[in-house]
Curated annotation (Swiss-Prot):
Molecular function terms from GO: GTP binding; GTPase activity
Keyword Lipoprotein among UniProt keywords: yes
Coiled coil: none
Matches recorded under Pfam families: Arf (PF00025)
Gene3D superfamilies: P-loop containing nucleotide triphosphate hydrolases
Gene: Arl5a
Lipidation sites (N-myristoyl glycine): G2
Protein name (database record): ADP-ribosylation factor-like protein 5A
Amino acid sequence: MGILFTRIWRLFNHQEHKVIIVGLDNAGKTTILYQFSMNEVVHTSPTIGSNVEEIVVNNTRFLMWDIGGQESLRPSWNTYYTNTEFVIVVVDSTDRERISVTREELYKMLAHEDLRKAGLLIFANKQDVKECMTVAEISQFLKLTSIKDHQWHIQACCALTGEGLCQGLEWMMSRLKIR
């Protein structure tokens, strides 16, 4: 009886899941947010502060916060961490010079108490650009295999075409079913 009640409750419970989208400036965070919400590319300018959109996938609601990635804004990322269930880190696969900065920011975030239960989705963006870093290279540079206390997934994508974005959302949906 308890299992039946739980399944019925899930059908009608429209809980919202908080997601933050972070990454260095010019990684493609805002483009990804608006691909999710409008399924189209919008002209963007550097995000000062944040953008927020509600995305509904199969009756599951995600409240997605796109947070500015400029160096001066990164110290304020932690103000968005409370109640976050998923962190999406967008990596510019063409930016070899700053991959170490991405790694530093990633591990700072993962050490924060408010994110201890958050799932981690890494979008390796701009995979359409010649000579970009592969998913394997990014995974190695970010030392993802050393992450033991968070569920994580890395997904190749191209924000401009939307390629790979649905697979990332599917991974997030699969993590919700496990809980």
